[in-house]
C-alpha cells in the first residue's frame, strides 16, 4: 500500500482586510520563470509568474510542469499534457477560522497551486455505488475513490503523484517529488505553493516543535488514519468498472481494500502533528513570526 497521500481536504475560504494577523505580503510576490521542458511527454515552455497588488497575490501561468514527468498518455491515463490558462488570485491577508471549511478539490476546483502554476487537486471524480459498480470518471454512488494509497484503481499517476485531466491539465494528487527537488534540498522545510484561502503550503518536512525553528526538521505526520472497520454499506468487491481511463486494466470481482475510498479514513485529534485540515500554526523559514500553513504529507 502506498504510504504517500495528500490529505489536505478542507480549505477555509474567508476574506477580510479589517485585520491582518497573518500577512503574506512580500513572500514570493516577484517571481517569473520561463524554461523549456524537453521531457518527451511535455516539450513545451513552463511559464509562470507571481506578483501582487495591495490586496492579493496574483498567479499567471500555463500549468506546464518545470520538471520531469511520467509517460503521458499511458494505458491508465490516455491524456496529453497541454498548456493551460492559469490566472488565480490569493488574498495576502488570510484569515484563520475555528470551524473546518467545506471540502474542495476534484470537480469543485483546485485547493492550491504549486509555485510552477500546476494545481494541487487530491480528490477524484471516481465513484462507486453500494453494489461495487465503479467509474473513474464522473461515476455515480457515494463512495469516493482515492487517487493514491491503493492498487485497485489505477489513475496512471507518475513519480510526482500526478496525472493529466482530459483537458490536458497536469495536476498533483500527492507529493510533488521532483518539484521539491528543484525547490529545496533533501530535508528542508520547503514552501511549494499557496492554498485557495491564501495560506502557504509546505511539503513533507517541518520543525519538530512547531514554534521553534532551532528544533530538528522532521517528516510531519497527519492525524488521519484508516478506520478499523469499514462503514456500513461499503462495497468490498469491484463488480464492474463502467468507464474512465484504466477501465481495461481492472478485472471485475477483485477486492477493494481499505484505503481505496475517502470514507475509509478518520481524523483523530492529536494522533499526528497536524490538524483536520492537515495544517498547523508554527514558524517557517519564510514566516519566522509564525503563520498557519498546510502540509502535503
State the predicted function of each range.
Residues 197-199, 209, 213-297:
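Extended, compositionally biased non-globular segments
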Residues 17-154:
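Solvent-exposed N-terminal domain segments of exported/luminal and surface proteins
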Residues 115-118, 166-179, 287-297:
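Extracellular/lumenal glycan-associated surfaces
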Residues 98, 179-182:
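Short loop/beta submotifs within extracellular cysteine-rich repeat domains
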Residues 115, 119-161, 244-280:
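Short, flexible domain-boundary/linker segments around small modular repeats
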Residues 3-16:
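Sec-dependent N-terminal signal peptides
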Residues 94, 124-126, 174-176, 205-207:
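A mature extracytoplasmic/lumenal domain signature
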Residues 187-200:
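Short amphipathic alpha-helical linker/capping segments at the junctions of internal repeats
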Amino acid at each position: 500500500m502506498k504510504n504517500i497521500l495528500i490529505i489536505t481536504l478542507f480549505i477555509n475560504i474567508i476574506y477580510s482586510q479589517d485585520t491582518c494577523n497573518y500577512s503574506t505580503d512580500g513572500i514570493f510576490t516577484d517571481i517569473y520563470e520561463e524554461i523549456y521542458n524537453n521531457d518527451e511527454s511535455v516539450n513545451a515552455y513552463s511559464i509562470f509568474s507571481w506578483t501582487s497588488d495591495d490586496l492579493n497575490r496574483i498567479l499567471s501561468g500555463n500549468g506546464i510542469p518545470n520538471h520531469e514527468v511520467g509517460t503521458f498518455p499511458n494505458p491508465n491515463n490516455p491524456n496529453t499534457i497541454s498548456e493551460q490558462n492559469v490566472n488565480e488570485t490569493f488574498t495576502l491577508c488570510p484569515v484563520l477560522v475555528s470551524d473546518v471549511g467545506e471540502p474542495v478539490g476534484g470537480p469543485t476546483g483546485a485547493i492550491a497551486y504549486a509555485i510552477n502554476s500546476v494545481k494541487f487537486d487530491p480528490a477524484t471524480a471516481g465513484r462507486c455505488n453500494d453494489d461495487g459498480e465503479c467509474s473513474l470518471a464522473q461515476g455515480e454512488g457515494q463512495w469516493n475513490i482515492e487517487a493514491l494509497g491503493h492498487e485497485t484503481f489505477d489513475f496512471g499517476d507518475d513519480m510526482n503523484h500526478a496525472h493529466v485531466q482530459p483537458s490536458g491539465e497536469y495536476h498533483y494528487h500527492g507529493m510533488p517529488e521532483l518539484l521539491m527537488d528543484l525547490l529545496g534540498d533533501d530535508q528542508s522545510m520547503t514552501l511549494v505553493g499557496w492554498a485557495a484561502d491564501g495560506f502557504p503550503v509546505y511539503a513533507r518536512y517541518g520543525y519538530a516543535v512547531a514554534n521553534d525553528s532551532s528544533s530538528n526538521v522532521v517528516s510531519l505526520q497527519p492525524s488521519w488514519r484508516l478506520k478499523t472497520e469499514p462503514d456500513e454499506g461499503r462495497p468490498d468487491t469491484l463488480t464492474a468498472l463502467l468507464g474512465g481511463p484504466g477501465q481495461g486494466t481492472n478485472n471485475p470481482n477483485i477486492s477493494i481494500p481499505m484505503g481505496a475510498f475517502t470514507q475509509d479514513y478518520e481524523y483523530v485529534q492529536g494522533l499526528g502533528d497536524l490538524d483536520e485540515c492537515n495544517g498547523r500554526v508554527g514558524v517557517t523559514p519564510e514566516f519566522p513570526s509564525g503563520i498557519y500553513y498546510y502540509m502535503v504529507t
